[in-house]
């Protein structure tokens, strides 16, 4: 069983989209739980409630919690293969303390970031103040990548910068699609999107991310 925390100091980096859709794809082959530990925003809770209201059966279990200590109880229950945890999108003192308690129960960290220079400083701060002191394995995910030449260039520059700084990252980016923007309002995840060429590409992104992560985790066990 593995607890995966998704975090970044900077809000608006696609954290919620990453959690819900990666969980949906992982749930195709594993028992998955999503935990909303961001009581200030409740983005994932609102998303899950919308899904329930519209009769959409999310492919994973879901719970919203206020106390990070619940993670140890969820681990002990051993009812899931992977638990994804959403956290506050800032590092103000109260949020930082909460994230610290979450990370104390965490096995792996994902840090989504946009392909723009303003994303680098908060990413480094998140890693240096919270992740590295605990010796946690982690990967950066480039998210919210628009499908135009300029953004592709910035994405490649960001990968180069991460490599030079020896910051580990996943090779698969999360590209922007209208379906992702609409999903919170409709309660959908990639596995329940209406089937179009674009939504097929969207689910491919998350399947590729899942393959990368499963490969990393398999190697960790050896």
Predicted feature residues:
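Inter-lobe coupling/hinge region of RecA-like P-loop helicase motors
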Residues: 182-207
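Conserved C-terminal guanine-recognition region of P-loop GTPase G domains, centered on the G4
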Residues: 121-135
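Beta-strand-loop-alpha "switch" segments that mediate conformational coupling across diverse proteins
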Residues: 158-191
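G-domain G4 guanine-recognition motif of GTPases
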Residues: 114, 138-153, 172-183
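Walker A/P-loop phosphate-binding motif and the immediately C-terminal alpha-helix
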Residues: 2-37
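P-loop NTPase switch/communication element
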Residues: 40-58
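Inter-motif core of Ras-like GTPase G domains
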Residues: 95-116
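Switch II (G3) loop of P-loop NTPases
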Residues: 77-99
């Amino acid at each position: 069983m593995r607890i995966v925390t998704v975090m970044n100091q900077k809000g608006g980096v696609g954290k919620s989209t990453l959690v819900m859709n990666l969980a949906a794809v992982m749930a195709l082959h594993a028992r998955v739980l999503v935990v909303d530990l961001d009581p200030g925003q409740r983005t994932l809770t609102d998303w899950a409630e919308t899904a329930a209201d519209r009769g959409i059966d999310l492919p994973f279990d879901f719970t919203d919690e206020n106390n990070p200590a619940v993670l140890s109880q969820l681990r002990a229950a051993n009812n899931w293969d992977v638990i994804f945890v959403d956290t506050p999108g800032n590092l103000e003192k109260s949020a930082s303390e909460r994230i610290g308690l979450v990370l104390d129960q965490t096995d792996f960290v994902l840090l989504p970031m946009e392909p723009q220079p303003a994303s680098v400083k908060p990413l480094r701060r998140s890693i240096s103040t919270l992740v590295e002191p605990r010796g946690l394995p982690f990967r950066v995910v480039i998210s919210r990548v628009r499908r135009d030449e300029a953004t592709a260039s910035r994405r490649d520059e960001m990968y180069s910068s991460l490599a030079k700084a020896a910051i580990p990252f996943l090779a698969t980016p999360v590209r922007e699609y209208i379906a992702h923007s609409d999903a919170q309002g409709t309660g959908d995840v990639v596995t329940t999107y209406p089937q179009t060429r674009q939504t097929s590409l969207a689910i491919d992104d998350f399947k590729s991310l899942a393959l990368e992560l499963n490969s990393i985790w398999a190697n960790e066990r050896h």
